[in-house]
Amino acid sequence: MALQDESLGIDQLSVDYDYLVYRISDRVKSLELEATRLVQRQNELVGQVSERVIDENIERFRGVLRGLDELEEYFAMMEQIGMITDSFKERLDSAMAALK
């Protein structure tokens, strides 16, 4: 029963990891697209700069920065998953050694 629980845990960890990688990839693409749009818009407005436009762009870039903060959290989650898998590998190696 414990082995089956461990197997389900590994499966869930794998699913969680894949989903996290997908979310990171999706978020990176989204942020890249938004940053590209902002830079293109900024270039278009170089000749027509106004304080209002600058403030709007600053707020949008702050949004991009918030998105990057989210990405940092995702990478921290990935690091935690790595630590969990390392710990599991050590326990598995220990269990295998005990069985020999």
Curated annotation (Swiss-Prot):
Domain of life of the organism encoding this protein: Eukaryota
GO cellular component terms, A-Z: BLOC-1 complex; endosome
Annotated TM spans: none
Record-linked InterPro entries: CNL1
Coiled coil: 25-46
Compartment list: Cytoplasm
Keyword RNA-binding listed: no
Principal localisation: cytoplasm
GO terms (BP aspect): endosome organization; regulation of protein localization
CDD domains listed in its UniProt record: BLOC1_CNL1 (cd24144)
Role noted for this protein: Component of the biogenesis of lysosome-related organelles complex-1 (BLOC-1), a complex that is involved in endosomal cargo sorting.
Complex and partners: Component of the biogenesis of lysosome-related organelles complex-1 (BLOC-1).
Family in the record: Belongs to the BLOC1S4 family.
Name the UniProt record assigns to this protein: Biogenesis of lysosome-related organelles complex 1 subunit CNL1
Organism listed in the record: Candida glabrata (strain ATCC 2001 / BCRC 20586 / JCM 3761 / NBRC 0622 / NRRL Y-65 / CBS 138)
Gene: CLN1
